[in-house]
Amino acid sequence: MKLNFAKRMSYIKASEIREILKVTEQEDVISFAGGLPAPELFPIDEINEINQIVLKEAGTKALQYTTTEGYAPLREWIANRMNGRLGTAFDKDNILITHGSQQGLDLSGKVFLDEGDVVLCESPTYLAAISAFKAYGCSFIEIPTDEEGMMMDVLEDVLSNTLHIKLIYAIPTFQNPTG
C-alpha cells in the first residue's frame, strides 16, 4: 500500500535538535548543545508541593481533559499575573497553554504562514523554529545580529527590498543559541 502524504511533508527534514538530544542520552556526555537544563537544578520539592496544593483544591478536575486552550484556572492566574506585572488587560481568553515551545511555534506557523512566504530570522537562530516553520513551505532570510539583537540597518534594507515577508522571528531575551 502506498501512502499519499500531504505535499507539505516534503518540506520536513530530520530534526537537528532530535539528533543532538540523542547524544545527550549517553551517560558519559555532558552536552551544552541541546538546551537541556541541569537536572540537579529541577525544583522537585517545590513541584511536589504545588502538585499537592492543586490536587487538594481541584481534585480530579485537575487530572481531567479540558478545553484545547488549557486549564481555565491556570489561564486566569497567568492573565492576572501578567496584568499585575505589565499593566496589561488580559483575561483568560487571551491565554493559550501549549505543551512547550515546539507546539507554540508549530501553531504560529499553521496560523500565519502560507507556502512561499518569507520569514526573517536572526542569524544564528533557534534550529527548532526553522524546522517548525519550514513545514509550512516558507523560506528564510537571515538577519545578522550583534550584542543588541538584529542589525537594524540590514533589517530595514531587507524589509524595503523583499516581497512576501510574513513574519519576523526574533528571540528578544536569552537568545538561543547565543545566550
Region roles according to the model:
Residues L55, K61-G179:
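Conserved core of the PLP fold type I
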